[in-house]
């Protein structure tokens, strides 16, 4: 079970633990992941994701899953998120209205 965000692909990062005496030892910083269900208003579907806290805040700030995916570059999304983005784009092209 990997600790990677399903939308952005953000994984664990590495750095140093610094003691009081300024000794440095390598350590890993894990991503703060949450199991969430995000709703696509355009597709009228629910999607389950393991999402980092930062990504969840960004999705809420952008106005929901649909608007986040449409306004985010595909290079910044995982394969799973790109597939959902493609479904949303196709639905918008068929005439489903996007509410802002």
Curated annotation (Swiss-Prot):
One family name in Pfam for this protein: Ribosomal_L28
Keywords: Ribonucleoprotein, Ribosomal protein
Gene label: rpmB
Protein name: Large ribosomal subunit protein bL28
InterPro entries in the record: Ribosomal_bL28, Ribosomal_bL28/bL31-like_sf, Ribosomal_bL28_bact-type, Ribosomal_bL28_sf
Keyword Ribonucleoprotein in annotation: yes
GO cellular component terms, A-Z: cytosolic large ribosomal subunit
Signal peptide: none
GO biological process: translation
PANTHER family xref list: 39S RIBOSOMAL PROTEIN L28, MITOCHONDRIAL, LARGE RIBOSOMAL SUBUNIT PROTEIN BL28M
Family in the record: Belongs to the bacterial ribosomal protein bL28 family.
Single GO MF annotation: structural constituent of ribosome
Keyword Ribosomal protein: yes
NCBIfam families: L28 (TIGR00009)
């Amino acid at each position: 079970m990997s600790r990677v965000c399903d939308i952005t692909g953000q994984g664990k990062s590495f750095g140093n633990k610094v003691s009081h005496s300024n000794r440095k030892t390598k350590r890993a910083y894990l991503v703060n992941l949450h199991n969430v269900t995000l709703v696509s208003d355009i597709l009228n579907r629910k999607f389950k994701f393991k999402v980092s806290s930062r990504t969840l805040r960004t999705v809420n700030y952008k106005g929901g899953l649909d608007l986040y995916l449409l306004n985010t570059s595909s290079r910044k999304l995982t394969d799973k998120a790109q597939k959902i983005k493609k479904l949303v784009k196709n639905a918008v092209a068929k005439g489903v209205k996007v509410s802002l």
